[in-house]
UniProtKB/Swiss-Prot annotation:
It holds the Pfam family DUF386. This is N-acetylneuraminate anomerase. The keyword Zinc applies. GO terms for molecular function: metal ion binding. It comes from Haemophilus influenzae (strain ATCC 51907 / DSM 11121 / KW20 / Rd). Has been crystallized with Cu(2+) but reconstitutes with Zn(2+). SUPFAM superfamilies: Clavaminate synthase-like. The gene is nanQ.
């Protein structure tokens, strides 16, 4: 997992080249003006823009991926993301959805929480469990975010 901000002048230091290029591309866009839905960045990388309502972590499922990295960027609002600090016990997870590259689980072992603010991004590698769109300070809110899907083979 990597956490930084698109406004940090040194955000690219240490990032895999393809992730740095994705972030450079995002910095050319008016993120607030992006319409919800899928946007292809190229023939292998795409992003989903969404405006979900945050919710209590207990009402949400954690997710992890096998073939894609997530680059989650908060555009508007605040959200907590619960993150697993250790390799997940996959026996606790639902069956893998190969078509959409995810596995779900009710909760995350050995978790910590990251509070996201606008222009921050978090990179989740395969098998890194995360539970996005959780409330901050117990207050639900409608947020706007995007999730870039990068095939792990490009890293």
């Amino acid at each position: 997992m990597i956490i930084s901000s698109l406004t940090n002048p040194n955000f690219k230091v240490g990032l895999p080249k393809v992730i740095a290029e994705v972030c450079d591309y995002l910095n050319t866009l008016d993120l607030n003006a992006l319409e919800n839905g899928r946007h292809d960045i190229n023939d292998q990388i795409y992003m989903n823009v969404m405006e979900p309502e945050t919710a209590e972590p207990s009402s949400k499922k954690a997710e992890l991926h096998h073939e894609y990295l997530d680059v989650q960027v908060l555009i508007r609002g605040t959200e907590n993301i619960e993150v697993g600090a250790t390799y997940p016990n996959l026996s606790k997870y639902e069956d893998y959805n190969e078509a959409d590259d995810y596995q779900l689980c009710a909760d995350i072992d050995d978790k910590f929480t990251v509070t996201m603010k606008p222009k921050m991004f978090a990179v989740f590698y395969p098998y890194e469990p995360h539970k996005p769109c959780c409330v901050v300070n117990g207050k639900t809110e409608k947020i706007k975010k995007l999730v870039v899907k990068v095939p792990v083979k490009l890293i």
